[in-house]
Amino acid sequence: MYAIIKNGGKQYKVKEGEVVKLEKFDLGIGEKVEFDTVLMGQTAAGEVKIGAPTVAGAKVVGEVVEQGRHKKVKIMKFRRRKHSMKQQGHRQYFTAVKVSSISL
């Protein structure tokens, strides 16, 4: 059983009991979160439900387990023949959510 949800302009495939790192949102650790924008899902019986654009009445419930930052991404700008370069880094914030139930 799985579902594809939309969060932060991205789509994520989630399963029950799985921990997924999503875009940061302001909730404390241990708080419940619901996702109503389920785009597609498969039931335990194997039936696939596709939304237009979302599956009606479907929701994914999870619990926030961690707030943090991803690994650093290094950006390097190099100007050829000028002996000049610029280096910059970025660390994106995330919220880790453990999926507790999927209802389609």
UniProtKB/Swiss-Prot annotation:
One of its GO terms (biological process) is translation. PROSITE patterns: RIBOSOMAL_L21. The keyword Ribonucleoprotein applies. The keyword tRNA processing does not apply. Keywords: Ribonucleoprotein, Ribosomal protein, RNA-binding, rRNA-binding. It comes from Francisella tularensis subsp. holarctica (strain LVS). This is Large ribosomal subunit protein bL21. Disulfide bonds: none annotated. GO terms for cellular component: cytoplasm; ribonucleoprotein complex; ribosome.
